[in-house]
Amino acid sequence: MANIRREKGLNGTIAIPGDKSISHRAVMFGAIAEGTTKVSNFLLGEDCLSTIACFRKLGVKIDQSGNDVTIYGKGLTGLQEPKEVLDVGNSGTTIRLMLGILANVPFHCTIIGDDSIGKRPMKRVTDPLREMNAQIDGREDGQYTPLSIRGGNIKGIHYDSPVASAQVKSAILLAGLKGEGVTTVTEPLQSRDHTERMLRAFGCTVEVTGQTVSLRGGQSLIGTEIEVPGDISSAAFFLVAGAIVPNSKIVLKNVGLNPTRTGIIDVLQKMGAILSVDHVRNEEFEPCGDITIETSKLQGIEIGGSLIPRLIDEIPIIALLATQATGTTVIKDAEELKVKETNRIDTVVQELKKLGVKIEATSDGMIIYGNQKLQGGIVDSHGDHRIGMMLAIASCIADGEVEIQRSDAVSVSYPNFFDQLASL
């Protein structure tokens, strides 16, 4: 539980912790690569630590010293049948991408997670993997955990994904690494492309044409060095705080600027935020840079279409941003929010209403009315890290103290979030 009341502006410089998506992939790809992989600025959140724990159970030696991680790759054929179940905790990325990897290995695994994972849909991954010859079972015919999988003898497929999901795309591509022939995934909209970028960094040939990605089976990954940029989804909370808390100016260092993830920057700029991006670097792998944001006069906008996959995780904090804009903001085409750690359409609306916000849920998003004053109150993260952090930023503009129940959920992706907020 956290009790927050803020009566002054937010000013200072913050180094954003490592990107969660990239940290997951660095460990997974390093585990199935040949040779050693060294990862710096690894995110020490609970989700990424679950990935390390699972691959250790698969026989991979992984050393960790602070934010530096060394993975001694086994190659895909070197993974070992685990003696116990693989527990992914709260991590949807871990379970879905790991299913793709395990589709290649001829042994049995059982995968479980926490209560939240037990409610999240898995057939979007298990169905295409079954088409590729993986043997998968689970509750409701593989829709929910626990799941069991036995892989081997994978064949490439051309899969037209009904959803723009990097997790679905990645699972299929990873299954195709040792598959027979070519594996191709086409999405309705482009999702984040960290898997494609990292496969190339590990020496794999990946072809990308528009929203279609393909690779030929039989390729091996070669260990490498990965420097993880800061997570723009974590930075988003401080970007919004800087824009809406009076008398604020925040500099965020080393923020990932992958074009498939920068929807939050586009939204802030369209709403009129005073924002600058400097010192862009590392563009050949994962671009990153420094972002400065300050208190701004904002205008409500409509958010939807191809922008949604580029900011799906930032929608809770964008909803808060919209409460301080002039006019109405409409978020649409965001049905995917319903199958996140919580139904984020419902939880965002429910919790912001407790702070006096006028906001409406729709079937695929929400309508947020602007120029609102927030009041203090008791709110709940629902065990969802992004809801918890959004509510913490909301407390900075509330008239009165805000008590956040289950605030420890933020440790999933941002263990030192409250410390950094207090430092400003």
From Swiss-Prot:
Annotated Gene3D superfamilies: Enolpyruvate transferase domain
Coiled-coil annotated spans: none
An example Gene Ontology biological process: amino acid biosynthetic process
Residues engaged in binding phosphoenolpyruvate: 20, 92, 120, 167, 344, 386
Keyword Protease: no
Pfam families: EPSP_synthase (PF00275)
Positions of 3-phosphoshikimate binding: 20-21, 25, 165, 167, 313, 340
GO cellular component entries: cytoplasm
Enzyme Commission code(s) on record: 2.5.1.19
Keywords: Amino-acid biosynthesis, Aromatic amino acid biosynthesis, Cytoplasm, Transferase
Catalytic function, reaction form: 3-phosphoshikimate + phosphoenolpyruvate = 5-O-(1-carboxyvinyl)-3-phosphoshikimate + phosphate
Superkingdom: Bacteria
Subcellular locations according to the entry: Cytoplasm
Main location: cytoplasm
Molecular-function GO term, any one: 3-phosphoshikimate 1-carboxyvinyltransferase activity
Pathway: Metabolic intermediate biosynthesis; chorismate biosynthesis; chorismate from D-erythrose 4-phosphate and phosphoenolpyruvate: step 6/7
Active site: 313
Signal peptide: none
Function field: Catalyzes the transfer of the enolpyruvyl moiety of phosphoenolpyruvate (PEP) to the 5-hydroxyl of shikimate-3-phosphate (S3P) to produce enolpyruvyl shikimate-3-phosphate and inorganic phosphate.
NCBIfam families: aroA
Quaternary structure (record): Monomer.
Family: Belongs to the EPSP synthase family.
Name listed for the protein in its UniProt record: 3-phosphoshikimate 1-carboxyvinyltransferase
Originating organism: Bacillus cytotoxicus (strain DSM 22905 / CIP 110041 / 391-98 / NVH 391-98)
Gene from which the chain derives: aroA
